[in-house]
């Protein structure tokens, strides 16, 4: 006999922008200011139920409950690192799981959110792609990741708030574009969480260069990061199969369009893999690729977090990383070696989720 899993069909109200919430309220016979009150309860007072919205009528609260849920996520696992990094595993209403990471930075609290359940991009070094994409994460489910992290501080009476967001968790954000854009507009709204656009970064592997061009016209000051990891097509294809359909020539044509349109800097993420992409010769190739664009470029060299399923890859040595960095600096490239977070927990993106799913399967076996 199999257990019936009841799946919640109501969407999370967190998935609506303020304008969408106002439109919904008016369509349901309410005044515009009622939607503004709901928005205030959600993001300024950060209530945990519609019933706590004390200046709304019982009839309106019933209507909200009929159409929406508030928080669709359930906390399953929390891992805390000695450096203050916290990794969360959340369960979605359909029993699927996603990861979220809180990082304490010198400039504030940064949260890394997940946009897809699994990933189909097929990067050969990444834990996220071990389990293929099941579905997109909705805008409400992405916002809920921020709200649950913020709840941790609110419940403890701590005067701290999430100040920065990086969309670099499991999945490819531009493969979930509509929900991504709603999420960004919700958290950036000055009347809500008010997370500054320049404090938000979206990362893409560039699998669809046209999406980078589309992003250039969204009229947001949000930062763009490119998961690059190699300066030539042959090497990049061996690491990231999406390069077959989106070679560097197409990718950089879109990036150049983006920078010309927005005049905003692009960050290039480059994971340092021992013996794969960390030689001085490859560093020079990277410098040659970035140099014509250096005014609006920044290279982020990232120490690799080993993944059990990808045993062929090892972290580049500190010496090789330093030599690579020196080549870039000698060529005038703006670059940094990224500070590590959560090295004493399941630090690699997707690692905690993969472990939990294996554990659940073992229990059922």
Curated annotation (Swiss-Prot):
Residues given in the record as S-adenosyl-L-methionine binding sites: 171-172, 203, 227-229, 305
Positions bound to [4Fe-4S] cluster: 119, 123, 126
Active-site residues (renumbered): 99 (proton acceptor), 349 (s-methylcysteine intermediate)
Cofactor descriptive note: Binds 1 [4Fe-4S] cluster. The cluster is coordinated with 3 cysteines and an exchangeable S-adenosyl-L-methionine.
Reactions this protein catalyses: adenosine(2503) in 23S rRNA + 2 reduced [2Fe-2S]-[ferredoxin] + 2 S-adenosyl-L-methionine = 2-methyladenosine(2503) in 23S rRNA + 5'-deoxyadenosine + L-methionine + 2 oxidized [2Fe-2S]-[ferredoxin] + S-adenosyl-L-homocysteine; adenosine(37) in tRNA + 2 reduced [2Fe-2S]-[ferredoxin] + 2 S-adenosyl-L-methionine = 2-methyladenosine(37) in tRNA + 5'-deoxyadenosine + L-methionine + 2 oxidized [2Fe-2S]-[ferredoxin] + S-adenosyl-L-homocysteine
Name the record gives this protein: Probable dual-specificity RNA methyltransferase RlmN
Any single GO BP term: tRNA methylation
Keywords linked to the UniProt accession: 4Fe-4S, Cytoplasm, Disulfide bond, Iron, Iron-sulfur, Metal-binding, Methyltransferase, rRNA processing, S-adenosyl-L-methionine, Transferase, tRNA processing
UniProt lineage: Bacteria, Bacillati, Bacillota, Bacilli, Lactobacillales
One GO location term (cellular component): cytoplasm
Function: Specifically methylates position 2 of adenine 2503 in 23S rRNA and position 2 of adenine 37 in tRNAs.
EC code: 2.1.1.192
UniProt superkingdom: Bacteria
PROSITE patterns documented for this protein: RADICAL_SAM
Family: Belongs to the radical SAM superfamily. RlmN family.
MF annotations from Gene Ontology: 4 iron, 4 sulfur cluster binding; metal ion binding; rRNA (adenine(2503)-C2-)-methyltransferase activity; rRNA binding; tRNA (adenine(37)-C2)-methyltransferase activity; tRNA binding
Principal subcellular localisation of the protein: cytoplasm
CDD domains: Radical_SAM
């Amino acid at each position: 006999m199999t257990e019936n899993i009841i799946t919640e069909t109501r969407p999370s109200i967190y998935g609506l922008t303020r304008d969408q919430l106002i439109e919904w309220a008016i369509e349901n016979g309410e005044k515009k200011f009622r939607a503004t009150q709901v928005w205030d309860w959600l993001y300024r007072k950060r209530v945990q139920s519609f019933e706590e919205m004390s200046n709304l009528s019982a009839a309106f609260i019933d209507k909200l409950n009929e159409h929406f849920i508030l928080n669709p996520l359930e906390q399953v696992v929390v891992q805390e690192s000695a450096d203050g990094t916290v990794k969360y595993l959340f369960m979605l209403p359909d029993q699927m799981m996603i990861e979220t990471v809180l990082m304490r930075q010198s400039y504030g609290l940064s949260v890394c959110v997940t946009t897809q359940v699994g990933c189909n991009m097929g990067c050969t070094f990444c834990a996220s792609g071990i389990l293929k994409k099941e579905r997109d994460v909705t805008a409400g489910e992405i916002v809920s990741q921020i709200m649950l992290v913020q709840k941790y501080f609110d419940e403890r009476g701590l005067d701290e708030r999430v100040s920065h967001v990086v969309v670099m968790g499991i999945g490819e954000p531009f493969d979930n574009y509509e929900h991504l854009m709603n999420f960004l507009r919700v958290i950036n709204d000055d009347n809500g969480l008010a997370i500054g656009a320049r404090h938000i970064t979206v990362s893409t592997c560039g699998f669809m260069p046209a999406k980078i061009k589309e992003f250039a016209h969204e009229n947001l000051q949000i930062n763009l990061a490119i998961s690059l990891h190699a300066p030539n097509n042959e090497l990049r294809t061996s690491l990231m199969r999406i390069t077959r359909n989106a070679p560097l020539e197409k990718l950089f044509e879109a990036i150049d369009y983006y920078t010309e349109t927005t005049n905003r800097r692009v960050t290039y993420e480059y994971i340092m893999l021992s013996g794969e992409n960390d030689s001085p010769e490859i560093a020079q190739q990277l410098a040659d690729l970035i140099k014509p664009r250096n005014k609006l470029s920044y290279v982020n060299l990232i120490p690799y977090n080993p993944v059990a399923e990808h045993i062929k890859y090892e972290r580049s040595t500190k010496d090789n990383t330093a030599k690579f960095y020196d080549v870039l600096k000698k060529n005038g490239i703006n670059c940094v070696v990224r500070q590590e977070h959560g090295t004493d927990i399941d630090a690699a993106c997707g690692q905690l989720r993969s472990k939990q799913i294996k554990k659940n399967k073992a229990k059922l076996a």
